[in-house]
Amino acid sequence: CPMSLKSLLSRPIARISAARETKKAGEPHARQSRLLQDLLKRAQNTAFGRDHGLQSGMTLEQFQAAVPIRDYEGLKPWVDRAVKGEADVLWPGLPDYFCKTSGTTSGAKFIPITPDSMPNHTGSARNALLQYIHNSKNARFVDGKMIFLQGSPKLSNTDGGILMGRLSGIVAHHIPDYLQANRLPSFEANCKEPWEAKVNAIVEETKNEDLRLISGIPSWVQNYFERLLEVTGAANVKEVFPNFELFV
């Protein structure tokens, strides 16, 4: 079948993106040095920066001596201050969100998501898709439906009034407009609880769609596919979604 305008346009965009990322990969030391200086310049006036004597122009060795490697518990005193709504603690201003992790090692953890860090989450996903298009010369998946298996996009608030949720649920609010028309499942299905009810709702919404891409934690995707095959009676996923081609 003929490709859509979106599919055709994605190829030159993918070529430009791949060239840019290849250039970045070719100068890792210079780029990391510039990044360190940018981070130092912006963090030196935060509480963490002052507590550790961070200054623009510090060498890598000076930075390593000033900020020893530590686990989450070592950062927790500063994180707790930011969670309560104090500004300029770990990064200038207030975080937009706190990502609450499941805490498999030592209880729940709160990871600040700032306006400066959010583009890293959405940009890396975009670059991965563009790299696939560039390498495979295939952009047909953009013409079909895409499932994003995520945590609930419902957000709560910290004691300091900052939005909080699972990382994938937070990122769900920042999926670019050019993917929204093809995006599944619905907001309502994504918010269902418990997990089994959510999977059932997503299967019902998607089983008759032209799915071409799925993204999510492997165990979640496996759970979805297993339920899909139970409901449809199909022998494999390809029987249900003949045009399915990409798992991110």
Residues covered by each model-derived region:
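Active-site phosphate/ATP/adenylate-binding loop shared across adenylate-forming ligases
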Residues: 3-31, 36-248
